[in-house]
Amino acid sequence: MRATFHLFTFIFLLLFSSVICISTPGFRNDHESIGDDEEKTSSTILVSTIDGRLRALDSETGEIKWTLQEEPVLRSPSAVKQGFTFLPNPLDGSLYVLKNSSLKKLPFNIPQLVHASPCKGNDGILYAGSKKDVWFGIDPKTGLKVETLSSASADRICPANQKQTIFLGRTEYRVSMFDEKNRGKTWNATFNDYSAHLLPEVNTWPFKHYASSSHGYILTFDRETGEMRWEQDLKQPVVALYLLRDDGLHKLPFEVMGKETMENVAKNIFTVDQWPTVLGVNAADPQTTSLTNQFFPALFVGESSFGLYAIEALVDHQTITYSPKLLGPPLLEGPAPIALTEMEKEEYLPPRRPIIRNIPPSITHKTSDGEYLLLGYHDRPMMTMATIIPTRYPVPGPHKAIGSTIERPPPQLLGPVEPQKHEDTSFILLLLNNHPIPFYATLVTMFALLLTVIWQCGRQWDQQKSTSRMDSFEIVNNPGESRSAQTSKQSNRGSFGWANRKIEIPEGWMAVGSKLMYSPSDILGTGCEGTVVYRGTFDGREVAVKRVVSEFVKFAHREADLLRESDTHPHVIRYFCMESDSQFRYLALELCIASLNDYVEQKEVQQNVTIALRDIMKQATDGLAHLHASKIVHRDMKPQNVLITMASQRGEMRAVISDFGLCKRVQPGKNSISRGIASGLAGTDGWIAPEVLISASTSYPVDIFSLGCIFYYVLTSGTHPFGKSLHRQANIVNGEYTLNKLADLDDWSLADDLISSMLNVEPLHRLTADAVLNHPFFWTSEKRLAYFSDVSDRVEKEEDNSPVVRRIETDARIVVCGGWREKICDALKEDLRKFRTYKSFSVRDLLRAMRNKKHHYRELPEDVRQSLGDIPDQFLHYFTSRFPRLLLHVYKATEYCSGEAVFKRYYSDDVRARMYPIVEEEERVRKKIKEEMANEVWARAPKPVEQRTPLKLDKRNIKKKSNPNTD
């Protein structure tokens, strides 16, 4: 109760002193006549973002009052040119140059270049610039632009209220750079800046602002209490903060931080012990903070809709920064390190941060010469020693006579010089000079009230702070730390989506969302457009975390959507979840032991893989067939995208299709994908089907072509059917390939036929995925023997001139190698003579012999069984090794019977659809021939003799005719 009483007393006295101060003469400005009902401009801050928007925010709540759209603060190229790439800073116009994939800071900024232009650098670069100033008046309540003043013209949109209109000055700087030796190298940029009064000291503003380097997040804290006052998301990077006053803009200080660093700050803002040391608020000397011990300066390289840019930002030790490659050993020996104990290192030295030095994981922009630019956080670059020499000199004054000698000053070098120190004009001194009486009255009243209230309310105040403190999402870096020390109340605040749960993150790992984390140092693979795959965990399960640059978020979402629909199949990689942060999208996928490329190239991988090579090929085809049945075209089939999973509890491994980033869905009612701007050329050189390059549309056969290349690559231990990589794509377009290395395989004829059908130049003549699965190359020994028996039964009673027999007996001498009796062993040859006669040149008789010996295998003599071997593998190998073309020949011949019930399991639907009109036509012709032959036989047959009956004469009529006069 006493604390409450004193609190009310404090508020009453504070209001009383404020009334006295306001009523004091001289407190109000002479020109101020705005009523009490109108909103004061001093409570409004303007936030400028890179897209050119000026947003008026309430300084107490962060609520957006109005928005004014202007030209973008920065416009710069998005392309990277070899040795001629510059990155401007939208905060102050400073410049960074990219050379040899390394960033350096130039000692001058865009405004300085414009003031010095035209000028020339010592590196042969020519600079030209221009400057345009403009004033525009706005209504501070609505943000409406009411008047524009410039040297060219003056436009008034509506009648200006001189009492309320505030004029803002804006300067547009345009700079162009040209290579003296190469006119093709040019660079242009436009930088807009607002004229503003500088606040004299940082501690005069009661708030401390933090802005994200890549997004428009703003966090605002009370400088004294450390309480977070408000947060706002403006969607675009913040470049400047201003206090809107009657006399114009007053620039406000703010810190730029990395997005992840701001998230870490949000996790600790209510921790009493860490808060003052982290941000330096509520400290004895606010100017002297411990930011240098907790955060590290870095350079953020980003890309907006208006071009590339670079902003210096503070990051913590968990943020990965890129460091330029070391080009060589140091020429001079460096100083000896200072010997420090481990305790001294922990106290005085900042923690080590992970730095990527050798492998650029996300090459976002790359030139043909190999120079690349990485988007993300870089070590703060060193300043170059580049200088520029102005070419303009002062014009002589009027007192100089014509023809007199003009003393020209030497050219000034604009380069890395010592920065000038400006005397700070304190904001408190401004108040003291302009309004001394209310200032002193307020100061004395506040001091007295603080002394009388703080000592009585100290304990209650501490308790109130402790009970109102909320802990956000907790990250435990040390799993061994006691649980009781880590337990705290959790909060739902924080605009970064921290979940109310606790996860343990191993040292060096990073968390994304509430369940997903990964190890940045454990890279499993890299892909195009900056894609990197890390080892990670999802909800305790080991997974592969695929990180995609946010610029390609469309592809990441499409990949996730397609995986959700297709990952139920055992041979499509499993998808778990997708998370995101400021720069990347993260996909949690099934963790695999190796890719098919690793299996072929690395022998140690083959030793750890228990699945057979032919099973890998068949399972990959099965996964692709599932995609095609789901109307999905993969478009990037290659050995790197066929993965082998970890062994299951039963020790089984699987082959799965992965990387759905380039997949496209065939729209309903269509059979192909048009090659427009959205589709583009998809795939990897050397594995792209020819129609992708020369046709306006593509479809499922593009995957079959790539799969055929993969089959040959796997069966030949790393050889490509279209030759070396240099001429590979040209050979693909021309249809020039060789399969000669398949001759070393036992099933060389089957492999040759399968791959040749998959690599056909005509897409419509290639096999479908189902036809590939039904090809005899993938049949087991049991299925092959059963097929031979079914064919023998089918043609046993057929006539010699029947269509199927004629097909089987075509080129029979080649199939049976001149005579199959000469190729079998003597024991089997002798046994065959005992029962019936076999024709040595007949494929049908060879199939009959195989069928009979299989059915009567146990009745065969011992020597014959030993020669044939066990059923099915050795028995089948006995015949196929002697007649390697037999299975393929019979398979092609009996396509005629693919529609019959017995043979449906051996052929795919597309084979039956292809053979149906052929069979129908053949049967129609045979039926017609039979009818014609029957008619011809009937016509040639002898006719039976016609039996005629003799005529019977009427004797009575004869008599009458012979005796007419009888009467």
Curated annotation (Swiss-Prot):
Q: Please give the activity regulation comment for this entry.
A: The kinase domain is activated by trans-autophosphorylation. Kinase activity is required for activation of the endoribonuclease domain.
Which residues lie toward the Cytoplasmic compartment?
Answer: 456-967
Bilayer disposition of the protein: Single-pass type I membrane protein
Reactions catalysed according to its record = L-seryl-[protein] + ATP = O-phospho-L-seryl-[protein] + ADP + H(+); L-threonyl-[protein] + ATP = O-phospho-L-threonyl-[protein] + ADP + H(+)
User: How does inactivating the gene affect the organism?
Assistant: In combination with RNAi-mediated knockdown of atf-6, causes sluggish movement, arrested development at the L2 larval stage, and lethality soon thereafter; larvae have intestinal degeneration and develop many vacuoles in the intestinal cells. In combination with RNAi-mediated knockdown of pek-1, larvae have intestinal degeneration and develop many vacuoles in the intestinal cells. RNAi-mediated knockdown restores fertility, reduces the accumulation of unspliced tra-2 in the cytoplasm and suppresses germ line masculinization caused by RNAi-mediated knockdown of rnp-4/RBM8A.
Every KEN domain range? 781-909
User: What is the name of the protein in this document?
Assistant: Serine/threonine-protein kinase/endoribonuclease ire-1
The species this protein belongs to is: Caenorhabditis elegans
Q: Which gene encodes it?
A: ire-1
